[in-house]
Every structure is written in C-alpha cells, then in structure tokens.
C-alpha cells in the first residue's frame, strides 16, 4: 500500500456487537414490519405511554414510548400477528419479546397474563423456507408477568443465511395468542407488544456475566 501498512491478525480488538453484528430491536408498533394479521379486529393500534402517564405501580418502561395493541375479532378468537425481522445476520441470536400489561396507564383494568405461542420462519442452508417452533423455544407456550413491562426469553435461534442488505426479503416471527376457552377468565387474548429483541448470543452471554455493562449500540427499527 502507498499510504499505510497491513498486518495479518487472528484477533480483532473489538466486540462483534459494536460493529458487524449488532443487537436488533424491532418496535412492534412500527407498521413497516407487520407482515400479516389473523383473527384481529381491524388494524392493530399504536398506543402511546410516557413516563408521566404510566401507572407508577408497573415496573419497567415502554421503549420508544409506544406499544402495539392487538385486539381479537371476537371474545372467543385468538389473534395472531407476523412480524418481519430486518437486518438479520448469519449468527445465533437470543430472542426476546417485551410485553405490556393492560394496567400500564390505568388501574381500572384487571390485568390478566397473556399466553402465547411463537413460530420463526427463515431460509435454511439450501435456501428453502422453513418454520421452527418447538425446536428453538424453551417452552411451547409463554405467559408474562402483569406487574411489569415483562421481557420474555423465547430461546436461541441460528440463522444460516444473512438477510442484511437483501432488500425486502426477511425472516419473520409469528406471535399467536394461545388462550383456551377454559382459561379465558384468567388469561388475556388482547396482546400488548412493546418490541422484539434479537440479541447476538455472544452479547447475551456477556451481559449475563457482566450485568452492569452498558450497551447502547443496538439497531432500532
């Protein structure tokens, strides 16, 4: 080179999540990433929450001061929504979803937990579209804590192909209410979703070992 030197190294003096493999945060209220709905009353609604309007008895904060409310088309219906997942790299992610309780701005509601199932859709090593659910989730169904803005760990998933820079071709996450008729008096079919987090597993492991580490370089969508 005419203007510098080149060295060969087997180690990069940086953490991958601060450069080529960032955390991805998909704000659920961003309609750009709504692929489809099922058994939903109208379009899901963006609901705003600020620190001033939030119920002080609910722990945690709603990211971006807004969440998505998904209403069932009837009292007996379990609604579902599919989210596109942008900028996914070929790596292993720890997947989280952040849920908001009904009492986030009011104490007049009786907060009931959601029960949900999740399915991830992606392309495999041969480029064929596949769906995975039980293979990558910790449990088949998940419930949230109604005393806080609750972050649920769904499990780890490995993407064999990268999608960043490929235009409108995305993997997706299907979120479906899973409340049986027997449980409808105790569980809520209305889903209030704050965001979806795809955290590189390397970062997830690091945060568990270093809980005071501050990381603010996630990619927000």
Regions found by a protein language model. Name each.
Residues 1, 7-8:
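Extended non-catalytic domains of envelope/secretory-pathway proteins
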Residues 10-221:
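Extracytoplasmic
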């Amino acid at each position: 080179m005419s203007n510098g030197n080149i060295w060969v190294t087997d180690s990069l003096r940086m953490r991958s999540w601060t450069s080529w493999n960032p955390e991805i945060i998909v704000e659920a209220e961003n309609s750009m990433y709504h692929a489809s709905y099922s058994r939903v009353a109208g379009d899901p609604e963006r609901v705003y929450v600020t620190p001033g309007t939030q119920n002080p008895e609910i722990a945690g904060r709603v990211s971006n001061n807004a969440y998505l409310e998904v209403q069932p088309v009837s009292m007996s219906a379990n609604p579902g929504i599919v989210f596109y997942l942008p900028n996914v790299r070929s790596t292993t992610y720890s997947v989280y979803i952040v849920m908001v309780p009904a009492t986030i701005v009011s104490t007049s509601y009786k907060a009931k937990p959601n029960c949900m199932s999740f399915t991830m859709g992606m392309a495999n090593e041969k480029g064929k579209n596949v769906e995975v659910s039980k293979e990558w989730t910790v449990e088949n169904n998940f419930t949230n804590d109604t005393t806080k803005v609750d972050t649920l760990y769904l499990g780890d998933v490995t993407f064999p192909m990268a999608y960043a820079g490929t235009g409108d071709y995305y993997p997706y996450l299907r979120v479906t209410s899973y409340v049986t008729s027997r449980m409808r008096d105790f569980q809520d079919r209305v889903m209030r979703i704050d965001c979806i987090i795809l955290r590189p597993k390397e970062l997830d492991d690091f945060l568990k070992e270093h809980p005071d580490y501050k990381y603010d370089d996630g990619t927000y969508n």
